[in-house]
Amino acid sequence: LKEMRGLAIIFRFFMLLVLLLPVVALCPVKAETTSEGPILIVTSYNPETRSISDNLSAFMDEYRQRGGKYTPIIESMNCKNLSEAYLWKSRMASILGKYKGKNRPSLVILLGQEAWSAYISQDTEIAKKTPSICGMVSVNGLVLPDDSIDTRVWEPESKNIYTDFSDYNIVAGYVYEYDVDKNIKLMRRFYPDMRRVAFISDNTYGGLSMQALVKKEMKKYPDLETIWLDGRTETFMEVSERMRRLPQNTCVLLGTWRVDCTESYVIGNTTYMLRDANPTLPVFTIASVGLGHWALGGYTPEYHAVGKNIGAVTYDFLDKGDREGVDLLTIPGNYKILGHRGCFGVHVPDSLFLDSHILYYPYQPLET
């Protein structure tokens, strides 16, 4: 009888164990974390913006797959128009001020030109000493003003991420380079009689940042006159009219064109309208804008998502402690030339199409 009772107890215990196994299996296993400060990710725009969202998702996936233990926290600058640029510096200071003591970030990641500019405009210990990584930014940048400023007449100095911010703890990043020299040389190879460069930029941080860079670089070419078609002070129609009246021996270098002085976003086909304002003008691009339907070509960055790369380098730096294997990386650019002679009535010297050093960009008409 005692043996039967013992067997019954064992059987009941076994059945209880069998019943509990599915419950245990369904319980989530908590990922291993660290008590160190979080990874603070500051974005220029709302995280739901596609470019930001894609990079954030790629970062999260890569960092988690590698077994990262630090907790990412996302803050947004919610940057809008260039006219509010003077607010970005204080907005960044407010974000950084929320993370003190034990909550101080182990790493700050900046995604977007505006967030990066606001960060390098800080003169605080947390900004300068905390390790930082940047993405979706260019080599050239601007330091923001302290006070309200009329951005229509603001002429900031172009800064270089490699040479001007040695007092910041920039441990890694993926940056694009807008190479003015290579574009001017390319334009001269096509049009050796070029006497003027008309540069088009819009009423955005990116447009002003490019304009500041071009102003800095054009000092190397005193024999060339520079004409500024500036969306900060001109409407789309005013720029279009000036395009009609540009003098001979002028080549256009296209920066970016999304917002004019009315702070209204222009629709995509406005570049077609600018093209039609003076279809015989030779146009080159420094940022891929206009390729395929207007610009003959240019030396431009190879834009691509960097979230996965940042996730990998973050894991190496924080979790593996690999401080030697991470660094700033300039994403290589490329020459892109429209492989379609006689397009838009612009004469392209035949000899240039025999040059093996030029990479061709196939002509693909875009819908208007």
PLM regions and their residue ranges:
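Short hydrophobic alpha-helices and adjacent helix-cap/hinge residues
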Residues: 3-6, 29-368
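Bacterial N-terminal signal peptides that target proteins for export
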Residues: 1-15
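Bacterial N-terminal signal peptides
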Residues: 13-25
